[in-house]
Amino acid sequence: MKIKFTKMHGAGNDFVVIDAINQSIHFTPAQWQHLADRRFGVGADQMLVVEKPQAAGVDFRYRIYNADGGEVEQCGNGARAFVKFVTDKKLTDKQAIRVETMSGVIEPRLEANGQITVDMGAPILTPEDVPFDVSGLLCKAEGADTLWPLDIKGETHWISVLSMGNPHAVQVVADADHAPVREDGVLIEHHPRFPKRVNAGFMQIIDPHQIKLRVFERGAGETLACGTGACAAVVSGIRRGLLASPIKVQTRGGELSIAWAGDNSPVLLTGPAVTVFEGEIEL
């Protein structure tokens, strides 16, 4: 089976994007893993699939597969790549589109300066809906947020727990560059209190309008940027009284801009999307 693809990235978070409107695809988890492999495949953090919509009132269906072959609910940086792809391929002539995902509808739009803004919807703040098992835990309040203790290697990490369509655990660190992201990230991802696993964010506060962030992504490991992780970190920081919107998020792959007006308001994610190359692969 030969598949045409486009390699893209958003702030270094890289993707293989596949048009499933004009070609038929039927991949196994092993084939997704092969496609993501940086030595034997194309190489990517996630694979993004463009499909015809199934729901009424939307323009496209957006599906996301992690490097481990598992399908996931949401990817903010990928949403920007998705918009650039459907625009460049002339699959739409709209500046703003409605896109169906596993976790609901998102509304990305192409800005005049070439940046792309994605309305990521309102965060989910109820632990049980993330999901996160709070049984037997004693939480503490910080500002409007609730912090939960998580035991990692015998040490207590105080985390914010929320969902941006996918689950996130966010903690504040003194120095993001030297935080044990890979060592602790995998333990947080697979912690038994997260039945669907979790994305682990390590946030350093620079000032009230700027943070440095590293994210260990569920099913992908540490990536150069994570859009939903940036949104989750900003929501956590604002609710804790540490940040004020808008916020610049420095990732290892570039800068993202996040705006959030508070509980029940949508989180707006703005950043770049870049096409690297196009190709064809036999699977």
Swiss-Prot record:
GO terms for molecular function: diaminopimelate epimerase activity. Pathway: Amino-acid biosynthesis; L-lysine biosynthesis via DAP pathway; DL-2,6-diaminopimelate from LL-2,6-diaminopimelate: step 1/1. Pfam families: DAP_epimerase (PF01678). One of its GO terms (cellular component) is cytosol. InterPro entries: DAP_epimerase_AS, DAP_epimerase_DapF. Signal peptide: none annotated. Substrate binds at N13, Q46, N66, G76, N77, N166, N199, E217, R218, G227, T228. The active site is at C75, C226. The keyword Isomerase applies. SUPFAM superfamilies: Diaminopimelate epimerase-like (SSF54506). The keyword DNA repair does not apply. It is an enzyme of class 5 (isomerase). Its EC number is 5.1.1.7. It catalyses: (2S,6S)-2,6-diaminopimelate = meso-2,6-diaminopimelate. It is found in: Cytoplasm. The record marks H168, E217 as: Could be important to modulate the pK values of the two catalytic cysteine residues. One of its GO terms (biological process) is lysine biosynthetic process via diaminopimelate. Its main location: cytoplasm. Keywords: Amino-acid biosynthesis, Cytoplasm, Isomerase, Lysine biosynthesis. Homodimer. NCBIfam families: DapF. Catalyzes the stereoinversion of LL-2,6-diaminopimelate (L,L-DAP) to meso-diaminopimelate (meso-DAP), a precursor of L-lysine and an essential component of the bacterial peptidoglycan. Belongs to the diaminopimelate epimerase family. This is Diaminopimelate epimerase. It comes from Herminiimonas arsenicoxydans. The lineage of its organism: Bacteria, Pseudomonadati, Pseudomonadota, Betaproteobacteria, Burkholderiales.
